[in-house]
A protein has these predicted regions:
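Active-site alpha-helical elements of protease catalytic centers
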Residues: 146-155
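Acidic/His- and Gly-rich active-site-bordering loop/insert found
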Residues: 2-146
Length: 155
């Protein structure tokens, strides 16, 4: 147990940094372009096999998809806000899904985790009683904020 505790303590600063980054750059459903690209980049570095975008999402099954103009505007914003260029194009048009497989080479059951990345269409509180505002990681995207923990799920 001591090694697990040590591992968690070692990872904690990076996990906090990632969560605050996702919180700061909140993106609504189907426009999580920056978030998905950051996640994809990290999973690739960790050695996961990756499938994404149109390879994992059926276009006709998406509900609540923004109009084409909104998708284009949000895609441009994600690129401006630092979405890794190598990955972001796979998600263009509202195909912000990722399937990551870690092949351990060991026999046994397959375990799946489902993680939501989208923010809510709400405005973040802008007063010092709200920790993200006070500590400088409140959403910089007006009308989008993580209010239900998906920034934590994604981390």
């Amino acid at each position: 147990m001591d090694s697990l505790t040590h591992t968690i303590q070692t990872l904690m600063p990076k996990l906090i940094e990632w969560r605050r980054d996702f919180h700061h750059y909140a993106e609504s459903g189907w426009v999580e372009f920056r978030t998905a690209a950051k996640v994809e980049e990290t999973l690739d570095k960790l050695g996961f096999e990756l499938a994404m975008g149109r390879d994992v999402i059926d276009a006709d099954s998406r509900m609540g998809l923004p109009d084409d103009a909104t998708l284009a505007t949000e895609f441009a914003r994600a690129r401006q806000q630092g979405a890794p260029q190598k990955w972001v194009t796979a998600f263009e048009g509202g195909f912000t899904g990722i399937v990551a497989t870690l092949n351990t080479g060991r026999p046994g059951p397959t375990i799946a985790f489902r993680v939501d990345m989208d923010a809510l269409d709400l405005s973040e509180a802008l007063h010092d009683g709200h920790r993200p505002h006070r500590d400088g990681f409140a959403s910089c995207n007006p009308g989008m904020m993580h209010a239900c923990g998906h920034d934590g799920h994604t981390t």
